[in-house]
Structure formats: C-alpha cells, structure tokens
Amino acid sequence: MSWQTYVDEHLMCEIDGQHLTAAAIIGHDGSIWAQSESFPQVKSEQITGVMNDFAEPGSLAPTGLFLGDNKYMVIQGEPGAVIRGKKGSGGVTIKKTNMALIVGIYDEPMTPGQCNMVVERLGDYLYDQGF
C-alpha cells in the first residue's frame, strides 16, 4: 500500500459524516511522504520545531505550532508521542511514529476527539509495523 493510500483512505476517511480538513505523513527529516491536496506548504524549520517538541515536550508552547501560514496554540498532548494544537474552531493532531509524523488538521463540525482517533489509530498501527 502506498503512503498516499494511507492518507486518502485512513486519514481523510469519513468519521460520523465528517472528514479531516487536511492530512499528511511526513518523515522525521521533514520530507513529505504523502499529503492531501489541501495540506499546507510546511517549512523544514516547522518540522524541526515539532521534532524538538517531541524531544523536549513544552518547547513549542511559548511560540505556538506553525504549519505553513497557520499558527496553533499547543494544548495538552502526550509527551514524546502526540502534539495537539488549537486554532479557532479547529486544530491539529500530530502523532510521532518511529520514522514519521502523522498529521491531521480539522475544523468544525469535526471534533478534536474524532481527529485524535483517526490520527492516533493510524499512528499506532504504523508504529507497530516498525514505521
């Protein structure tokens, strides 16, 4: 299965009639493995900041989490495993696996819990597969 298939069928899937706004699978080095058409153009330093926050939880909190031109307020996640951000009525969930970051961006009416479930379920599966 291609990485794009994981994005299209497992991240951008329908959950209770709702979909993520955008999603991507990004290597720890910042390389894009696959992304939805709507995923923002991220800068390498933004991925470096995310990786630093996984290594030192809380390092993004003072500045916020940036993905492309969007700034998210960092909210409670799981140190070293999941980063969550909020922006208005939407937000982002980032799950770290052995080799990649699974990123899901949502907006109302999708809920944070639905986004977390979609992103973390795929992240846990890929982690268990060695990715």
UniProtKB/Swiss-Prot annotation:
Keywords carried by this UniProt record: Actin-binding, Cytoplasm, Cytoskeleton
Gene3D superfamilies: Dynein light chain 2a, cytoplasmic
GO MF, any single term: actin monomer binding
Gene Ontology CC annotation, any one: cytoskeleton
Pfam families for this protein: Profilin (PF00235)
Highest taxon, organism lineage: Eukaryota
Compartment(s) where it occurs, according to its Swiss-Prot or TrEMBL record: Cytoplasm, Cytoskeleton
Family: Belongs to the profilin family.
Subunit structure: Occurs in many kinds of cells as a complex with monomeric actin in a 1:1 ratio.
Protein name in the entry: Profilin-2
